[in-house]
Amino acid sequence: MILVDSSIWIDHWRSNDERLVRQLGAGQVLAHCFVTGELALGNLIHRQAVLTALQDLPQATLATDAEVMGFIADNALAGSGIGYIDAHLLAAVRLTPGSQLWTRDKRLLAVGLRLGLAYAAVH
C-alpha cells in the first residue's frame, strides 16, 4: 500500500497522474487524516466529493504524538529539514505494515529513502 502525500495529489489534480490512477484502481492507495486536512485547506474543485473520496480510502495507522516524538529521536530526524507532519507520515508508514510513502517533497523523500519507507516512483 502507498500513502500518498499532498504533493502527489496536488500534481494529480493539475495534470492527471496515470501512476496514481493505476494505484487507485488497484486499491493500493492509503490516505492519512493529516494529508486530507492539508488538502482541505486548499481551494478544491468539487470540494466535498474530493474530501469524501479521500476519507473513504483505506487509512494509514495514525501515530500518537508520543510515538512520533520517539520516532524522531530513534531515527535522528532533528535537523533533517522535514516538518512535524512529515514525521507523522513517516511514522504512520512505519506503523502500517507493507506500506510506503509517495511524495515529491525532496527533503521528505530523502529521509524516507534513508529509512526505507519511501516509494521511489520514477517521476
What are these regions (language model features)?
Residues H12, E18, Q59-H123:
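Active-site neighborhoods of divalent-metal-dependent phosphate/nucleic-acid chemistry enzymes
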Residues M1-F34, A40-T52, P58, L117-A118, ...:
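Short, well-structured N-terminal submotif of metal-dependent ribonuclease cores
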Residues F34-V35, I72:
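Short, histidine-centered active-site or binding-site loop motifs used for metal coordination
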